[in-house]
Amino acid sequence: MPMRRRQGCISIHNQTRATVVCHQVRIADTFLSRLVGLLGKRTLTPGTGLLIQPSSGVHTWGMAFPIDIVALGRSYEVVGAWQSVGPWCIRGLSFKTRHVLELPTGQIERAQITVGDELCLVAASGACD
C-alpha cells in the first residue's frame, strides 16, 4: 500500500545494501503534485528526492536538469534504474512499476542501487524544503 504523508518528509534506505538513498524525500501523491513533479525547479539538492506514487513511469519534458530515476514495484523493490536522464525523456514505463523515485544525478551510483534491491521508507522529522 502506498505511504501517504502530506506534511514533512521521509527518508529512503536501501535495505539490501545497507545504504541511505535519500535523507529528505517529498511525496507526490495527489494528481496536481504528480503532474507538477520537479517542473520549475532549477536543481535537485544532494540528499533530496521526489517519490511519485502511484506512478507507472515518468517523463522529463520541460525539466531544466538531468536526474536519476528509480522505478519501484508494489513493495518498493527496484524494478528499473536510469542514471543522468536528461530533459525530454520517458523512463520507467512498465507493468511492474508502481512508484517512481526521482533523485539528483549520481545518487544511484552513490547509494549502490541496482535492480532487485529492496528499499524502505522511513518517517523523517522536519518539513521538506
Label every model-predicted segment.
Residues M1-D129:
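Compact, glycine-rich, soluble single-domain proteins
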